Amino acid sequence: ATCRKLASRARTHIQAARPRFPVSREQGQEIAAAFFAASRFGDMERLRALLAEGVTAHADGGGKVPASLHPLAGIDAVLERHAQLAAEFARAPSKLVRYAFFDGLPGFVTIEAGEIVQLTALEIDGDKISAIYVMRNPDKLRHLGLGSPGNRAGRRQA
């Protein structure tokens, strides 16, 4: 059983195709800050420069808060979604709580419209963002110590 589990984990790691060497904390924080600013202020040119061509975006609302139902794949799909979100951020700006690392990935915690707590983690390969992970599921965010995340309707995220 132990051997099968090790083999299963190895296959999962290979299929994930994650970068072999993690980004430095300093570089990760710089990229996370640049991504936050570009995505919140609708700077699509800067956002394009930060994203890898094959970037993917995943969101988890746990069925309790709005989130994209399917992953986005490719730079054009991710940019299109972030252009939509930038218009929403202009009406209801995100409140940045802090930058941090989550499971080794740089990112940030925000409070979105409807008092929804959101964690965004960025997988970085070289100097480009290869994957965006957005966690909005309140059950999985309780450990952040930000009180009770809101469950009211908010906007969908990428």
Kindly label every feature range from the protein language model.
Residues 2-84:
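Solvent-exposed, charged amphipathic helical/linker segments at domain boundaries
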Residues 76-158:
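Low-complexity, glycine/alanine/valine/leucine- and proline-rich hydrophobic stretches
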